[in-house]
A protein has these predicted regions:
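N-terminal carbohydrate-binding/catalytic regions of secreted carbohydrate-active enzymes
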Residues: 76-167
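Hydrophobic faces of well-ordered beta-strands that scaffold small-molecule active sites
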Residues: 89, 104-108, 128-132, 191-193, ...
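Surface-exposed amphipathic alpha-helices with a cationic face
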Residues: 117-126, 184, 216-225, 263-267
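Chitinase-like catalytic core of GlcNAc-active glycosidases
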Residues: 134-192, 196-258
């Protein structure tokens, strides 16, 4: 499990820029699942990310001009998988995949699992999602040296990880292209890009909601160009702007924070919402999850094999 936090001071700065005052939230909020053990959980007081800026013509910062190289086009015969609401799933990011869960969808680590692992799941009739961190540098990944120092920000609270400067599209795009190539070449059906709401955290960079929208749309286009479907991880405030670009959603703890209704645009569009709770008992949220048609379960924070579905 990954914890995403936004300090009260950082939020006040963002709100002041918008002519607002106040700071909400008083308990630490868990965030993206990762499958590694943090050196220490973040201690900053959480709050909601700043409200997304309205859509409109976007220009890249002067230090990071938009890429001019077009994305590769998928094969005309490639059909992007469109998971429907209500599908059961397994989310295992801790180690090599265990295939014992009898569910149609598996979400597993793209680096730690092989093409043979994916093929074994396919033979059992499963669809397989490739977990990839696109918002933070990880010193334990084989491509760690591909990231220049200029894009590395503050530590994000997890051992060996630092936030990325997502404004530098021309630097990050080819790295993410290679990662998504890996997912495609291993036979994955989809991508789960992690940490796509850095703008709501103290990253060390002055990231805005508009920067995040630009980056997230680029990530979605890279996946689609490779015939992969792509899920929006958390980032609830930007769902209205991004639901058309993503094929499903992955959410952590919307029930605990009474936010699950914010995911309704995905369900209304016929797109699955894969949802997990870590501390809430099933009796406290499963009825509402069924009403909203979410694919919900309880998992332990380390995201191993154990699961308790609604």
């Amino acid at each position: 499990m990954r914890r995403r936090q936004l300090s009260c001071a950082a939020l006040l700065t963002a709100l002041a820029a918008a002519g607002l005052t106040g700071c909400s939230g008083s308990t630490e909020r868990p965030a993206d699942a990762h499958g590694t053990t943090p050196a220490a959980p973040p201690t900053a007081a959480p709050s909601r990310p700043p409200a997304p800026e309205p859509e409109g013509p976007v220009t890249s910062p002067s230090h990071s001009p938009p890429p001019t190289r077009p994305a590769a086009s998928p094969s005309p015969s490639t059909a992007v998988w469109k998971p429907r609401p209500g599908l059961s799933w397994q989310w295992q990011l801790d180690g090599k995949v265990d295939t014992s869960a009898d569910v149609p969808v598996y979400d597993i680590d793209g680096f730690e699992n092989s093409a043979a692992d994916v093929a074994r799941l396919h033979r059992a009739g499963r669809k397989v999602i490739c977990y990839v961190n696109v918002g933070a540098w990880e010193n334990f990944r084989p491509d760690r040296d591909a990231f220049p120092h200029s894009v590395l920000g503050k530590p994000n609270g997890w051992a060996g990880e630092r936030w990325l400067d997502i404004r530098q599209l021309t630097v990050l795009r080819p790295i993410m292209e290679r990662r998504f190539d890996m997912c495609r070449d291993k036979g994955f059906d989809a991508v789960e890009p992690d940490l796509v709401e850095g703008y709501g955290n103290d990253t060390g960079f002055p990231l805005t909601a508009r920067d995040q929208l630009r980056y997230n749309r680029m990530i979605a286009s890279l996946a689609h160009a490779r015939g992969l479907s792509v899920g929006l991880k958390n980032d609830l405030p930007q769902i209205p702007q991004l639901v058309a670009h993503f094929d499903f959603a992955v959410n952590e703890e919307c029930a605990q924070y009474d936010e699950c209704a914010a995911l309704s645009p995905f369900i209304a569009a016929g797109k699955a919402v894969f949802h997990v709770e870590y501390t809430e008992p099933r009796s406290g949220f499963c009825a509402e999850s069924r009403r909203l048609r979410l694919s919900s379960m309880v998992k332990k924070p380390e995201l191993g094999v154990w699961r308790s579905p609604c």
